Amino acid sequence: MILYPAIDLKDGNCVRLLHGEMDKATVFGTDPAAQAAKFEAAGCAWVHLVDLNGAFAGEPVNGAAVEAILARITVPAQLGGGIRDMATIERWLSKGLARVILGTVAVENPDLVREAAKAFPGQVAVGIDARNGKVATKGWATETDVLVTDLAQSFEDAGVAAIIYTDILRDGAMTGPNIEATEALGRAVTIPVIASGGVSSLPDLIALRDTGVIAGAISGRAIYDGALDLQAALAALKA
């Protein structure tokens, strides 16, 4: 299982939100590129990036910070937040991003996901953000009646590289991930599932790994707070 350290970008800074609320942002650093380089130096195989302003605006906002990160690291990076059209997808992949994450657009325009996944094999992931099993969109501000498993299964034949599943109520709360729901999703689809939201300790990571159906886990606040020792986590996942 791959550990994806998260860099959430707001106004060019590295932050974490609580429950996805922009006014509950804690700034952890003002140099995201340096933070990404630290993650690579620690041995991380990937870096997970989120353009928070972009998720709310519906278009990329923290582009300069993302480009600075891509210039600093050699490991692959994935980015979500405000990527809602083919031109933006093409632009980011041409700039060296390894994978784009499509969230809101996966609900509103699933054909775009299919088109992008076909055009860029292995480089398009679907981000499914949920509250109580229902999908939320537009930076989590809009709730839908779409069920997580239904949305995920609708992309089974689309060729998407991964599904990034975030439990909004766990995100940034340090309460542990929703292992039950994430495992159920992992069993419901053949697409690799990456867990996000609430991963706050080494036991959380081990529990996710031990399901045998979760391909990766994203953690942010726990790493910055020191609750999750990056070196120990990477070593444990290699064991």
From Swiss-Prot:
GO terms for biological process: L-histidine biosynthetic process; L-tryptophan biosynthetic process. Keywords: Amino-acid biosynthesis, Cytoplasm, Histidine biosynthesis, Isomerase. GO terms for cellular component: cytoplasm. It holds the Pfam family His_biosynth. PANTHER family: 1-(5-PHOSPHORIBOSYL)-5-[(5-PHOSPHORIBOSYLAMINO)METHYLIDENEAMINO] IMIDAZOLE-4-CARBOXAMIDE ISOMERASE. Belongs to the HisA/HisF family. HAMAP family: HisA. This is 1-(5-phosphoribosyl)-5-[(5-phosphoribosylamino)methylideneamino] imidazole-4-carboxamide isomerase. The gene is hisA.
